[in-house]
């Protein structure tokens, strides 16, 4: 039976019974794309502010297509009570729609909020270039812009273009310069361990061509950037949209979109302060290794590592969570999980990629990109695309607060 989509704007609170569990999960539809509307929403980004507020962002695609094809704005909503209710929709930044202009559109946002202050950083694509087009080159690059807040997202700076600050990091690479890139949308990683500058270190994972993913990092909350592993490092050659996460010992994991699952790689520091270190070899995670399988799709997802308690013996552990559409195709977004070993140093790429637990199914309909963060109450804030419409160009942007007990079939909290 097909689910009929009701073309009204729904801002209220709903309850959903999980497909895998009888527990009730709170659900908010933050942005809705009516099927009759020609202006779609897409692309989730979320951050938890230092003061406890939660900011959710999304593309509002007036051009009807991806960033690079015309005018795209970024809209937002804020929760000031931990996700229980949400304020009105607002425009964070508006594209001019002027063809060829650097401010033609703004989209594919990635965001981080500093854990020690009210500082917030949003990175996004700007302009009217298409990432994969042959005409998008080092001389005509996919451009990168930032917005900054110093007061937990209440007010924002003027946008600033930082394209050259990123691209020049790779101009002297033995592999040649980066022709086109963008920061993987959703959540920028802030280290829980490394602070050698004004702020805890942040990492942004790049989708880049040629030669796949790169990772950049900053010790001054995005004022200056460095290439993790140096300009020649290729964490995931030919990788697609990526995310970063940090192991409890400070090593960095990149998780990259792949057909049928994910690609993982781990960065081993030799000197955390200077950033020196080396990437390993890529490991695939999919059905073959009992990994994070996604049937008949490749899609942006989120990797998150959180502290937890194993309910069987009350032992404190760390869990890795990875979201993907379970499929077939872009449908049935879910969350895989696995307990990390107590000896974190023993984690290898092969062991991390394999043997994940049966996933929790978040959505029971068409669904795609997702991101998540750990709330102060220990639950998971999950923000994702659902009810895909307009031939895949639009969706509803849905927020759910999900307890770890629900995700892990009552094994952890």
Regions found by a protein language model. Give the residues of each.
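Positively charged n-region of N-terminal signal peptides that target proteins for export
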Residues: 1-5
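Bacterial N-terminal signal peptides
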Residues: 7-15
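Asp-box/BNR beta-propeller blade signature and adjacent active/binding-site loops
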Residues: 19-413
């Amino acid at each position: 039976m097909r689910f009929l989509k009701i073309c009204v704007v729904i801002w209220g609170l709903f309850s959903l019974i999980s497909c895998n569990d009888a527990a009730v999960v709170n659900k908010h539809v933050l942005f809705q794309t009516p099927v009759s509307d020609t202006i779609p929403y897409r692309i989730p980004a979320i951050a938890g502010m230092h003061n406890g507020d939660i900011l959710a962002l999304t593309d509002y695609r007036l051009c009807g297509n991806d960033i690079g094809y015309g005018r795209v704005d970024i809209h937002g909503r804020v929760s000031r009570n931990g996700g229980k209710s949400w304020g009105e929709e607002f425009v964070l930044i508006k594209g001019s729609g002027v063809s060829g202009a650097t401010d033609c559109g703004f989209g594919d946002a990635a965001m981080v909020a500093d854990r020690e202050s009210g500082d917030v950083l949003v990175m996004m694509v700007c302009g009217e270039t298409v990432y994969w087009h042959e005409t998008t080159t080092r001389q005509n690059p996919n451009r990168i812009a930032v917005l900054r807040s110093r007061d937990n997202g209440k007010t924002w700076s003027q946008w600033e273009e930082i394209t050259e600050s990123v691209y020049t990091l790779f101009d002297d690479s033995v592999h040649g310069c980066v022709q086109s890139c963008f920061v993987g949308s959703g959540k920028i990683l802030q280290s829980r361990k490394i602070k050698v500058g004004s702020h805890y270190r942040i990492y942004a994972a790049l989708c880049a061509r040629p030669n796949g993913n790169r990772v950049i990092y900053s010790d001054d909350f995005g004022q200056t950037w460095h290439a993790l592993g140096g300009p020649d490092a290729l964490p995931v050659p030919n990788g697609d949209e990526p995310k970063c996460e940090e192991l409890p010992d400070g090593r960095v994991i990149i998780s990259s979109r792949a057909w049928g699952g994910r690609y993982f790689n781990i960065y081993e520091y030799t000197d955390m302060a200077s950033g020196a270190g080396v990437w390993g070899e890529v490991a695939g995670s999919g059905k073959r290794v009992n990994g994070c399988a996604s049937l008949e799709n490749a899609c942006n997802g989120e990797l998150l590592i959180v502290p937890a308690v194993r309910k069987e013996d009350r032992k404190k552990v760390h869990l890795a969570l990875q979201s993907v559409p379970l499929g077939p195709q872009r449908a049935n977004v879910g969350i895989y999980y696995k307990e990390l070993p107590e000896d974190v140093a023993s984690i290898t790429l092969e062991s991390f990629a394999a043997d994940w637990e049966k996933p929790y199914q978040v959505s029971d309909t068409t669904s795609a990109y997702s991101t998540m963060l750990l709330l102060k109450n220990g639950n998971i804030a999950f923000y994702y695309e659902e009810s895909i419409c307009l031939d895949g160009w639009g969706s509803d942007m849905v927020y759910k607060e999900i307890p770890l007990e629900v995700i892990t079939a009552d094994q952890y909290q």
